[in-house]
C-alpha cells in the first residue's frame, strides 16, 4: 500500500507573533495545510493520507478540513510527536495499528508547509521509493555553499556541482525506515533530525528526485509573502 504522511507538527516559532501554527495560516485566503492536502488528494495511488498535527490542534485540523470540504475518506488526522522523526513514527504506528505493515508498503512524507509541490514530484517519489526503498526531493544548489565551524571563519567550500538543497517529499519503504530508526541509539535519534540521513547512516542508498525552485517551505513572514506572490502570479506549474 502507499501512504502519504503530512507533517504538520510544527508550532511556527520562526513566523513571529502569529495566533496559529504556520500550517494554519492563510495564503490566498485558504490555510497552507489545505493547499497541500488538495495536491495529495489528486493522487489516486494513495491508500491513506495521514496528517500528523500537535495533539492540541487535532480538533482545529478536523474543523478546517470540514470547512474547506475535504471529505475524502482517505484523509486521517493523528497526533504528531516531539520532533520530526517521532512524528513520522507516529504516522507509521497508525498505519501498523489500522492496516498492518507489508514488505512493499511505501510512505511519502511531506512538509505541510510546502504547498507548491507538483503531481510529477509526488508520483516520481512513489515510483522511486517503491523501486529503490528511499528517495529525497532536491534542487541543485545555485549559490556557493560555505562551511564554518565557529560561525566567524570559512573552513571549507564544497564543490558546488555536488551540492543539492533538500526539499520534501522524502519517501521510503516503511519497513526500511522503521528498522533504520529503531537501530539508532537515543543520542543518534536526537542528532539525526532528517529521515534521509537516517537511511544514509544505515548504509542504504537514497535516490534523488528533482524538485522545483517554487516548492518552498513557508516558515517565515517573508516566505508567506513569497507564497502569496507565487499563487497570485501563477508561477507554480502543476
From Swiss-Prot:
Binding site for CTP: 7-10, 81-87
Family matches, as SUPFAM superfamilies: Nucleotide-diphospho-sugar transferases (SSF53448)
One Pfam family in the UniProt entry: IspD
BP-aspect Gene Ontology terms: cell wall organization; isoprenoid biosynthetic process; poly(ribitol phosphate) teichoic acid biosynthetic process
Domain of life (superkingdom): Bacteria
CDD domains: CDP-ME_synthetase (cd02516)
Function description: Catalyzes the transfer of the cytidylyl group of CTP to D-ribitol 5-phosphate.
Assembly with partners or alone: Heterodimer together with TarJ.
Protein's recorded name: Ribitol-5-phosphate cytidylyltransferase 2
Organism: Staphylococcus aureus (strain NCTC 8325 / PS 47)
